[in-house]
Amino acid sequence: MESAYLPKSVDPERSADQGLEFAGDLDPAPLARLGELLAAQAGPISSRFGFRRDEEGRAVMVGSAEASLPLICQRCTDLFLFEARADWRRVFARSETDEQELAEKGLDVCYHGGPLDVAELIEEELILALPMAPRHPEGCEPVARPAGGIHPFAGLAELLKRETRDN
Ligand SMILES: [Zn+2]
């Protein structure tokens, strides 16, 4: 069963029982933490996710989100749209012990009853999908250094020369 909208919050246990799936767009405007990392306002985020149970009966959420995120290229310092894609799989542990065991296996695990904030989760996943050093994927020209001008370290070289002489 798939709903053509994103809910504000979901209950992983109940959704897993019903095998619920959701797909829709999310407005990035209220996502302040993501917004701080962007050079301009992002376009709509499209996401889909679903719930089911694993072999041991735990609720599992599998989802993805895509968005064009405006970033500053670190090579040419121009703005470009980074096509972000986040994929996640979260397991909902049944106890703290269960959570520890799953985390040791390297799984993305949570142990909290109650509903999940959908916007917060998608925001978190997109932040994780941001590149450490954003660059135009198609390549670009590095920022031109001032030609024929004063070398930025000229002053420093003079200073060093003077110090050597003084000692
Ligand atoms: Zn660039």
Which sequence ranges carry the predicted segments?
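Conformational-control "hinges and anchors"
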Residues: 76
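Charge-rich, low-complexity linker and terminal segments
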Residues: 1-19, 43-44, 81-167
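Short cysteine-rich clusters marking metal-coordination/redox-active sites
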Residues: 73
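A positional/architectural concept
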Residues: 1-70
